[in-house]
């Protein structure tokens, strides 16, 4: 027994020694709280980001599953191109057999250079934490270079776990000079923004042109009924397609993939059949000599025909835009192993058929199908066309949703149709506008040849924009060697410039349509973003002074009412100018008041545990806080009850930590969790809280097992315990517990949302153009867009509005 007591005392002495060692390290590593709280920082919590290693590696089974799904989502558009490429390339007739070989050679090397080399092996790597598309490129660039037109950057944002991309090379003076030039030039920022919204507008325009050309081409298989009947049937299919959008595409990957895979099997198999039956010698087209000979023979007409050849790569941008649903390896495997071989066989087979029947060029695809397979192929072709249309329509919805998050599009209703597939959204207003536009295009153009003229411009324009933006990313983000940047830029821009010049030649024959549509969208997006920026600048210049808050705290006429008030503003720093208007109209304040700013970051997603930032608004006893809620452009806004729960849990954790800092004296540091995978605090329901405690310093503990089960005594006599997830925290002092209980009681009394309705007008001294843009164009868009409360998912029964006029 004595031995046991001795061992126990010895253990206690050893534990005490270890505890003192821990305390000494805390003292050695202490951080001055006064120095840490920068003017531009919200709180210490902003600097505590998850140390979780984001594992982007996916096992081969998951990759194969994603590969299969990607076939149905990504390749419908490029897969249906064989329906109309030869018809668009030879609108009149085929001059000679050598011309067929020349066009086939052009198609082969266009497929090799643009989709395969450029996109599959280069552009896909320029993703924004797994997301692709023009906005993703802009967002990626915005995180490395301050090119955003809205000055709401915070140091805390750069510390998010998804914010930074690992740079593959050493820093170079060249990239720093380019970065400095871009950050200091307002014109470059505006140009980059305009190029971005031009690219997104073109992709949205594809949501109109793809359904038209794909469905018309597929239905043309029953051309014996006459062109008017084909147009009528196509319009009926399109109406059904758009009306079905509200049902969602939850099973899009697995349900569409078998059909598109069957389609590629059909076109590849039929192509091989025609190749061996009619003329296997067309494989000579792999020799680029036939491509150059084609231009020598045909001159200007050969150049014009490139507008049809480029349709072979329609849908290439979808590989990049839809990357967020899959991964790079899945796209690379599916394109290289299935799509590319099937397309080569299809085009080679059609070329072999045309060498024997050149007069059938206007119906190449259907004429080349063996009779027993005609109707099965027709059915699968219509299904593939619908799927291709579906993918582009869904892509248009996703892009507009991203635009909304970045303040570049009027507020519209966004419905998330899938809990499983992120980014699957439905926008009713946009859906019916696209449907009407599709019907008008079908009625106006009637043939795939004219629609192809319009389609080509949209396809090539987006490719040119992608080339330019990836080049900038190579310079600034990747810091690639100049020789490789030169090869990439000049190699692809020359090819795309030739194609662009060809499709622009057909401007009057339908090419004006995507440009007009994109210009219209750019005006809407530009006006909305401009006012969004100016509103933010107005609030920043007119934010409430600290003296006003102090006077308010001392004002006996201001009543405190039970509950939590959430006052929404776009400001990430300071108290918004709408607050005095609330006080003037309603001379009372809730027992807990939180100034909430919804901030969209230039990244696809923000982890839930990194979403909330808090800071106390002095005086402390007044219980006023600021909160920045950060979302990525693919994040969905939570339901009110869940949002309130997350915010209150985060606020209580902030209060706990504030008291730990203020009461801890020298021990102003907390330790690193032993397991970085579990750095979030857990609520009672076992779910990660929205606002987690993150660690600033690593603490090497002499005996983790003993420390985790025991206590650490600081010099002040305060006992701090170490939780199961490795976080050393102080026990709640009376004031902290009381304040947290006040917050909890206030939540139980109810949460009220306070929303300022700003009427934006131009200053009297503004130009006539600015007055028209602000007073008429913007206000027309605002009146016809969705209310801010609905966009933020604020329950109407608990919403209080106060109006104010902003002169910008």
Swiss-Prot record:
Keywords: Cell membrane, Ion transport, Membrane, Potassium, Potassium transport, Stress response, Transmembrane, Transmembrane helix, Transport. High-affinity potassium transporter that functions under low potassium conditions. Involved in the positive regulation of salt tolerance under salt stress. InterPro entries: K+_transporter, K_trans_C, K_trans_N. One of its GO terms (molecular function) is potassium ion transmembrane transporter activity. One of its GO terms (cellular component) is membrane. Pfam families: K_trans (PF02705), K_trans_C (PF22776). It catalyses: K(+)(in) = K(+)(out). The chain crosses the membrane at residues 66-86, 103-123, 190-210, 222-242, 252-272, 303-323, 328-348, 380-400, 425-445, 457-477, 483-503, 511-531. Induction: In roots, induced under potassium starvation and salt stress. Residues 1-65, 124-189, 243-251, 324-327, 401-424, 478-482, 532-808 are cytoplasmic. Residues 87-102, 211-221, 273-302, 349-379, 446-456, 504-510 are extracellular. This is Potassium transporter 5. It is a multi-pass membrane protein. Residues 699-722 are annotated as: Disordered. The keyword Cell membrane applies. GO terms for biological process: positive regulation of response to salt stress; potassium ion transport. Expressed in the roots. It comes from Manihot esculenta. Its main location: membrane. Belongs to the HAK/KUP transporter (TC 2.A.72.3) family. It is found in: Cell membrane.
